[in-house]
Structure formats: C-alpha cells, structure tokens
C-alpha cells in the first residue's frame, strides 16, 4: 500500500514530462523563425506530429527493452553491437554540439543584458569560457549541479508560459499577418528551413519514459503522459513563438540575440526586458551545467560497454568523470572556434542544424529496430501494429528533418557518421570475433 502511495498519477507524469522537455532550446527560436516569417507555424505543426510520434515510440522502447544503454540498446535489437555503438556515438556527438549551441544562447542573452556588442571572435571566446566554467563547476559531482538545474529551468518556463498567457494583450494581428512570408520564399522551402529549429526545441524527447518506474500502471499511463506532455510542450512552444511575432516587428525580432527579453521590453519596459534576459541567462547556464555532466555520463557509460576509450570511465572520489569532462570540453572549444560566423545567430544556426542531424541518426536506428524489439519481447499483436505504425511516422519525420537541415549540415553529419564507422572498426573485435 505504501509503495503504491509513493507512485505518481498520469496527470502528474504528464506535467513532469512536459517540464522536462521544455529547456533552453526555445530561447533563441523566435529570432530564427522570424527570418522565415510566421509561416513557420506550419513547421511547428509538422514537428508537433513528428515529435509526438517519436516520443510515443520511445516510451514503448523504454517500457519493453531488456537491453541497457538507452537508444544504443534499442538499436542493438536489429543492428547488433555496431548499431549500439553508432547510436551512442552519434548521440554523444550531438550532445557535444548541442551544448555548444546552448552556451552561445547564454552569451547572446548576456550580451543583450549588459548592452555589449561582441565581435565573432569575442562570441567564440565567451562561449568557450562559459563551457569551461560549467565543466569546472561539475567537478564536485552530480548532486549540486542537479539541484541547480532543476531550479534554474524555471527561468525559461515562467517567461515562456507567461508570454503564452498574457502576451495576447499586446498582440497585433496585422503585424503577424504582414510577417507571414516576408522574403516570398516558396512555401515548401520555407516550411523545411524551419524544421531543424522546431525539432531542436524537442531534443530530449527520447528520455520521455525516464520516470516509468515512478508511475502507477506504467504500461497504460506512460504512453498517455508522453503524448500529453509532448503535445502540451508543443502548444506552449507554438503559442509563445507566434505571440512574439505579433508583438515585435519582424525585422527587429530577426536581428535580436535575446528575443524573449525584447518581447517583454515591448510589452512593459526595458527594466522588465532586462529581468527576463537575466532569467534566461541563469536558466541557460543551469541547463548547460546539467547537460555537461550528462554528456560525460553518456561517454562514461559507452566506455564501460567497451565502445569508447577507457579514460572516459575514470571517476574521482565524488563520482565525477573529470577526465572525460575535460576531453569533451576541449572538443567543444575546438568546435566553437571552427564555427566562428559573422554573427551570433549564424553560428547558433550552424550548430543547431548539425546537432539535429547527428541526433536524428540514433532516432532512425531506434525506430527501425522497434519492430524486432517488440517481437522479441512478445508484445500483444494490436499494440505491436499500433506502435510500429507510429514509429514509421516518426521515421518519415526524421528523414524529412535530415533533408530540411540543408546540404552543409548533412555533409558534416555524414562525415561524423563515417568517422563513427571507422572508430567502430577499432573496437569491433571485442564484440564481433567468434569466441
């Protein structure tokens, strides 16, 4: 009885799933979407359907998979150890890239907060400083940084949800309509350009079932919570980014490095805008703090499985994989310098497109393996058919996201993938030689 009383219900899990999905990915999106116009609402709708399908399929993976290693374990059902390696490798690389983009977001809001104009090199150097600061603070272990991250996430959620509710008072319908497609880009192309950015806001949906053990009747309630949480996050994302487009003129929004702060300044005054910018910087850094530790843990787990070099699994007395953290941040430093662009927004866009491409690869591997996973675990026929169909929708969306990311991101993403196959060749003897 006491064990049951400690379980959470479907409504609580739905809210928890939604909150976990809403991170710092949203804070730069109004700027990127303003470059395309308010036609990007169609991209949001496409991504909402695709992301919900992926999240539901991942919830089923988590419910029924008997293999460890997250997406790598799912992929192993169809693709063996090579698939496990590639899923974990591309996922790890995507997190390295994504965290660099999060650091750039923090720098963008920080520069607006303090009223400074940064050169391309200065942006890179401040990004590097932010990454190293987050890494060093993680040397003390996960508990402190976990507590900080769970608090600072509200620095994003409160303004985003707030503007979704009260922003309509300042919404100008004619401004929104005039911003529909300011550059007269063909409709299909305009929708495609925005897909990477809208999917960026949902990265992390693969962990939607992480709280399955804490819920009553998980087989029934987890899929409901995942669907509800993903759709709830989608509604807030769509409403918040679109209401801003009716508050701030399109050109001004497209050139901003702190769009939510700018919107609140338009709604109230500069002081309120600065407060929102401060909250966003705090939240961004808190998110970065948590994700820097998470990346090191992903690499550590892969090293323990024998996929990555052994030094990634070395830990200190405080259970912090410090050597791995330093190595990862060194790679991020190099990435920050390699992607220096004429503006902060351009550098952010390059990193987001590449992060999405590398993150979608383990999504595709997991979706493709789901049919075998469900058969191996003797899932009921009707549930099997429904889940495989939903996974197919998720796969179609993932392939479209790859196409929409553009030639440059696909080129670099392909190189990253081919490097992965090469690296697997050096460790495959541990798994593929017949004993």
Swiss-Prot record:
It is found in: Cell inner membrane. Disulfide bonds: none annotated. InterPro entries: AA/rel_permease1, Amino_acid_antiprt, APC_superfamily, Symport/antiport_PotE. The keyword Ribonucleoprotein does not apply. It comes from the Bacteria. One of its GO terms (cellular component) is plasma membrane. Keywords: Amino-acid transport, Antiport, Cell inner membrane, Cell membrane, Membrane, Symport, Transmembrane, Transmembrane helix, Transport. The chain crosses the membrane at residues 8-28, 39-59, 95-115, 117-137, 148-168, 185-205, 224-244, 275-295, 320-340, 354-374, 386-406, 409-429. Coiled coil: none annotated. GO terms for molecular function: putrescine:ornithine antiporter activity; symporter activity. It catalyses: putrescine(in) + H(+)(in) = putrescine(out) + H(+)(out); putrescine(in) + L-ornithine(out) = putrescine(out) + L-ornithine(in). It is a multi-pass membrane protein. The keyword Oxidoreductase does not apply. Pfam families: AA_permease_2. NCBIfam families: 2A0302, antiport_PotE, PRK10655.1. Belongs to the amino acid-polyamine-organocation (APC) superfamily. Basic amino acid/polyamine antiporter (APA) (TC 2.A.3.2) family. HAMAP family: Putrescine_transp. Catalyzes both the uptake and excretion of putrescine. The uptake of putrescine is dependent on the membrane potential and the excretion involves putrescine-ornithine antiporter activity. This is Putrescine transporter PotE. It comes from Haemophilus influenzae (strain ATCC 51907 / DSM 11121 / KW20 / Rd). The lineage of its organism: Bacteria, Pseudomonadati, Pseudomonadota, Gammaproteobacteria, Pasteurellales.
